[in-house]
Amino acid sequence: MRPLVCVFTMFLLALLSSNTESVAVMSVDMGSEWMKIAIVKPGVPMEIVLNKESRRKTPVAIALKENERLFGDSALGMAVKNPKVTFRYFQDLLGKRADNPHVKAFEARFPEYQLVKDEHRETVLFKLSEELTYSPEELLGMMLNYSRSLAEEFAEQPVKDVVITVPAFFNQAERRAVLQAAQLSDLKVLQLINDNTAVALNYGVFRRKDINATAQNIMFYEMGSRSTICTIVTYQSVKTKDSGMQPQLQIRGVGFDRTLGGIEMDLRLRDHLAKLFNEQKKSKKDVRENQRAMSKLLKEANRVKTILSANNDHMAQIEGLMDDIDFKAKVTRQELEDLCADLFNRVSAPVQHALSSAEMKMEEIDQVILVGGATRVPKVQELLLKVVGKEELGKNINADEAAAMGAVYQAAALSKAFKVKPFIVRDAAIFPIQVEFTREVEEEDHSKSLKHNKRILFQRLAPYPQRKVITFNRYTDNFAFSINYGDLSYLGPDDLKVFGSLNLTTVKLNGVGESFQKRSDYESKGIKAHFNMDESGLLTLDRVEAVFETVVDEKPEQESTLTKLGNTISSLFGGGSSVPETKENATDSVQEEDEVPTEPTKEEEQESADAADKQKDKEKGTTATNEEEEGKKEEEKSEPQEE
């Protein structure tokens, strides 16, 4: 298995194509509150796209007014006048069922929206009228399409290829929802890249000369508008087969909090301002019942919070908050910190979880780097400095643009139009995935019972892209197996509720018995299920096949060196065709190429342990192996359908 190779030339990108009309590529860092766009085009190695207001970031907001769509700052202006038709923070609803706690929390915080259940998908829809509804994927698709229009205007040429950032804790359903949104906007997604990985790549590329054979462990602490994620990354030069010594980053540990971010502070300050207005008794009405007024207060709360990061106090003021009544009140930094005390108590948890998952101690971390706009809050920095025990926190990358720039490096690497230097990226899957199945076994008293089996497909923090094969040794007739998330006990009870169903899909195999009957003279080598986790962290079931072997006698003069020749026949269920096993579709375990540091990683040690237990697994009825990554990955042949 080869690690994902990300390549980039710091000062020069060589254009391979003579056609410069449509070779630009883009990245979109789609946060909950802000969107950042970057491009690479001939003559412009990397650049952040300016929006129509010449700003480097654009509010993630859409206003749907009759036959007109407004985006960004224009949409925010509409939010004050008509909050019901201005949509924000809808990414929180991607890939989630209507009964998810995140959906309930969204409804409570933003009562101006009417959410209804999509009876077909069991997800949610925004209802504008009896005839008009929009899904979160459709809204995200509109925003992505707008991002492309900004990129094309800035690049002065068509742009179709894109790398999109997603939170590292996005599960399979959430990632597929982002892909669906991109398809609606007619964008070609080169890759979904985890935003923490994009940040780490951006940091490493600009420090390429500082990376050597000695491992450097860097902790990135990112607090954005909606969530917080802490990532431990190891940078090191490694020897590759084709390119000699090259820099590599490896994701070693990850900790996160889905609901710890700047918007939580804004909402608490908004409610505090509403309380102050009611206490002034300038109106007999409760301002909290007025959606337009609450929208104004949320906007003002965000502004005041930002100013309080540099000042001890500030005056909140809104003209015509409600019924032409002006509002003015003094807010201190201490008041804000008191309002958010329980939030600040959660600052340290992602650090501890990242260290635990990496099996590292804080003393092994060389530097802590701040990322994300909410890390500018003084209290966050104070608490973080205390928990990491460092003299200072690193602020030497652009906290707002690092993810967008890292993603656009990857876009240039994946594009056929640009030639760039190698930078190896070994990303890690946060959530383990396993295969579960039930088979009939015979007890000592000759009675029969059903035995439930589990086989880990991808460990927690397993590197990807990666292929795996599960071999079912004891089935001769039709059967089914489930693909589920593995042990998630490291998540809290609230996180598990938000996570949703642990079942990804159930695969039912037909034609197994018929295949065995047709090849009764052959020796079965099991039924092999081929899985692929691609560069976007998406799991697919490529194919399932029955493998048979026949023994052919050789000529006497050859018996001294070869007495038997194995002839493998693979029967693909559904098609029933026989496919010889070749290097391209090999299902046996293949040793990985030596592209990693001399000291084995956690994942490699686990793989060695798995190999040692291979015989034990066969007794259970399955074995799992890796497949060799041969150049470009095969095109996905089939995808499991969700129940």
Swiss-Prot record:
Primary location class: endoplasmic reticulum
Biased composition (Acidic residues): 590-610
Biased composition (Basic and acidic residues): 611-621, 630-643
InterPro entries hit by this protein: ATPase_NBD, Heat_shock_70_CS, HSP70_peptide-bd_sf, Hsp_70_fam
Disordered: annotated segments: 565-643
Gene3D superfamilies per the UniProt record, alphabetical: 3.30.30.30, 3.30.420.40, Actin, Chain A, domain 4 (3.90.640.10), Substrate Binding Domain Of DNAk, Chain A, domain 1 (2.60.34.10)
Record flagged with keyword Disulfide bond: no
UniProt keyword terms in alphabetical order: ATP-binding, Chaperone, Endoplasmic reticulum, Nucleotide-binding, Signal
Signal peptide annotation: 1-22
GO molecular function, one term: ATP-dependent protein folding chaperone
Any one GO cellular component localisation term in the record: endoplasmic reticulum lumen
Top-rank lineage group of the source organism: Eukaryota
Database matches in SUPFAM superfamilies: Actin-like ATPase domain
Subcellular location: Endoplasmic reticulum lumen
Family label: Belongs to the heat shock protein 70 family.
PANTHER family: HSC70CB, ISOFORM G-RELATED (PTHR45639), HYPOXIA UP-REGULATED PROTEIN 1 (PTHR45639:SF3)
Protein function: Has a pivotal role in cytoprotective cellular mechanisms triggered by oxygen deprivation. May play a role as a molecular chaperone and participate in protein folding.
Protein name listed in UniProt: Hypoxia up-regulated protein 1
Organism: Xenopus tropicalis (Western clawed frog)
